[in-house]
Curated annotation (Swiss-Prot):
UniProt PTM: Phosphorylated. Differentially phosphorylated in basal and agonist-induced conditions. Agonist-mediated phosphorylation modulates receptor internalization. Phosphorylated by GRK2 in a agonist-dependent manner. Phosphorylation at Tyr-166 requires receptor activation, is dependent on non-receptor protein tyrosine kinase Src and results in a decrease in agonist efficacy by reducing G-protein coupling efficiency. Phosphorylated on tyrosine residues; the phosphorylation is involved in agonist-induced G-protein-independent receptor down-regulation. Ubiquitinated. A basal ubiquitination seems not to be related to degradation. Ubiquitination is increased upon formation of OPRM1:OPRD1 oligomers leading to proteasomal degradation; the ubiquitination is diminished by RTP4.
Protein name: Mu-type opioid receptor
Reported effect, C346A: No change in palmitoylation. No change in palmitoylation
Sequence intervals crossing the membrane: 67-91, 105-129, 141-163, 184-205, 229-253, 278-304, 313-336
Membrane topology reported for the UniProt record: Multi-pass membrane protein
Chief localisation class: membrane
Organism: Rattus norvegicus (Rat)
Source organism phylogeny: Eukaryota, Metazoa, Chordata, Craniata, Vertebrata
């Protein structure tokens, strides 16, 4: 027997035993249509998050224009800033050789996960405005799985970055062999494989359901629904929040003790300054992630344990938690621009290219063409050399 924990539940809204909110929404984790179905007041505001309709139940009517405009404006800002910022981060890391460090390889992975997450916002916006999911089952599966992949890959990558910082600060000798771009790429692949442990099952569980003339994108659970629903919530809370936060806390606790006890880490003031700067940047990124994601995780667990009455404060706080989760996907590029001089310089060169930058790009293209067409380059060199000799021979004598 299949059922959903989100708005895709086929039960009628008037049924007091309904397991989920009656309003449709895309099946993303932040929208929680598959994790956080409202079990206490199924006809209340859609608990599925920003992407769901405020109230499509018979008692409440259509969502207000102010709510719709506010949510759409927020979605648009997060989507544009998130996509542009994260793609710019990935471009800078790929484009500039000096940016291909182990830490930046992890940042690339984080930017990729955030870009994928923000790319789902247009679908969720359309779903919100139309009150139905018009994109079919395949896109439903993709959107839901992307949000799970983003959540797990992001926190796993931040965990990895914290461990990487710990090794760099507390074990600098071992760091020389371990902290390489090649190893960072391997670790990134492993993070995506680990995320597949939840991402792939969710993709198979995602489906579309018809309910009262509309289509819902939601997850289906085997009987008993309440057991599998709560099990998923608990697994997400433990493996995507509690355990990673504990690992991150231990790593930074040990780093702080090390930095306080040792005045010089590498024997060079310049290297120490860079080491502390990068450590500070990673710490800020991790802290912002935890601040943005803690409310939604706590909210989901509380609603799984107790019944929360529908009030204006509950509605506002729920939407605030959802907004924080999505906003995190567009904050990281801003943090890099303010906290890392290399990123700041590369961003500036991309947005406002100087003459030296253009000359450097042209010389890079020439070198690439020379490597790709060595015979042509040799011919041009010989021709130029012959012309120089000819000019020297035909030049008038003094």
């Amino acid at each position: 027997m299949d059922s959903s924990t989100g708005p895709g539940n086929t039960s009628d809204c008037s049924d007091p035993l309904a397991q989920a909110s009656c309003s449709p929404a895309p099946g993303s984790w932040l929208n929680l249509s598959h994790v956080d179905g409202n079990q206490s007041d199924p006809c209340g505001l859609n608990r599925t998050g920003l992407g769901g309709n405020d109230s499509l139940c018979p008692q409440t009517g259509s969502p207000s224009m102010v709510t719709a405009i506010t949510i759409m404006a927020l979605y648009s800002i997060v989507c544009v800033v998130g996509l542009f910022g994260n793609f710019l981060v990935m471009y800078v890391i790929v484009r500039y050789t000096k940016m291909k460090t182990a830490t930046n390889i992890y940042i690339f992975n984080l930017a990729l996960a955030d870009a994928l997450a923000t790319s789902t916002l247009p679908f969720q916006s359309v779903n919100y405005l139309m009150g139905t999911w018009p994109f079919g089952t395949i896109l439903c599966k993709i959107v839901i799985s992307i949000d799970y992949y983003n959540m797990f890959t992001s926190i796993f990558t931040l965990c990895t970055m914290s461990v990487d910082r710990y090794i760099a600060v507390c074990h600098p000798v071992k760091a020389l062999d371990f902290r390489t771009p090649r190893n960072a790429k391997i670790v990134n692949v492993c993070n995506w494989i680990l995320s597949s442990a939840i991402g792939l099952p969710v993709m198979f569980m995602a489906t579309t359901k018809y309910r009262q003339g509309s289509i819902d994108c939601t997850l289906t659970f085997s009987h008993p629904t309440w057991y599998w629903e709560n099990l998923l919530k608990i697994c997400v809370f433990i493996f995507a929040f509690i355990m990673p936060v504990l690992i991150i806390t231990v790593c930074y606790g040990l780093m702080i003790l090390r930095l306080k006890s040792v005045r010089m880490l590498s024997g060079s003031k310049e290297k120490d300054r860079n080491l502390r700067r990068i450590t500070r940047m990673v710490l800020v990124v991790v802290a912002v992630f935890i601040v943005c994601w803690t409310p939604i995780h706590i909210y989901v667990i509380i609603k799984a344990l107790i019944t929360i009455p529908e009030t204006t404060f509950q509605t506002v706080s729920w939407h605030f938690c959802i907004a924080l989760g999505y906003t995190n996907s567009c904050l990281n590029p801003v943090l890099y621009a303010f906290l890392d001089e290399n990123f700041k310089r590369c961003f500036r060169e991309f947005c406002i290219p100087t003459s030296s930058t253009i000359e450097q790009q042209n010389s890079t293209r020439v070198r690439q063409n020379t490597r790709e067409h060595p015979s042509t380059a040799n011919t041009v060199d010989r021709t130029n050399h012959q012309l120089e000799n000819l000019e020297a021979e035909t030049a008038p004598l003094p």
